[in-house]
Amino acid sequence: MSIKILVSAVPLVAAALFAHGESLSGPQPCISVGDTSVQIANLPGQAALHVSFTDDPALATVRVQIAETAEGADFAVVDDAGNSEGGACAANAATRLVAISAGATGNAPVIYLSAEGPADYRIFVRSQAFTAREAAALVVGAGDGHHRLTAASL
């Protein structure tokens, strides 16, 4: 009897953990642009903007180049625990949530991320909290997927 209860409880516990995964996963990558925050969504259904990535530059709607230096980038993410802007990316009513999708959907931006070639945005990422893909998604999300970003902060 106790084994049956345990076996039936395991899927319920797993479902509960999955449903509340955002509280267990910690803060998601986020940037502030003016009065707006742009954050990677915990769950794709939460996001107003979905972006995807392609390895084919001909399929891209936005090109993001990985810069070799922070000076050569429009946007830089560098982990620096001693120089963090506390609350710079606090979630608020104006927070835009961005999800990274496995494939292109509708009019959603398709990002070509590369170290070479022409680019709409240039990013520099040296971080344990952000990946280059997440930084690219946030920068594109900050520009509504179509416009160049002027200034952002962590």
Where are these regions (language model features)?
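Bacterial N-terminal signal peptides
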Residues: 8-16
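Sec/Tat signal peptide C-region and signal peptidase I cleavage site
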Residues: 17-21
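Bacterial N-terminal signal peptides that target proteins for export
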Residues: 1-8
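Repetitive, compositionally biased segments used for assembly/scaffolding
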Residues: 23-154
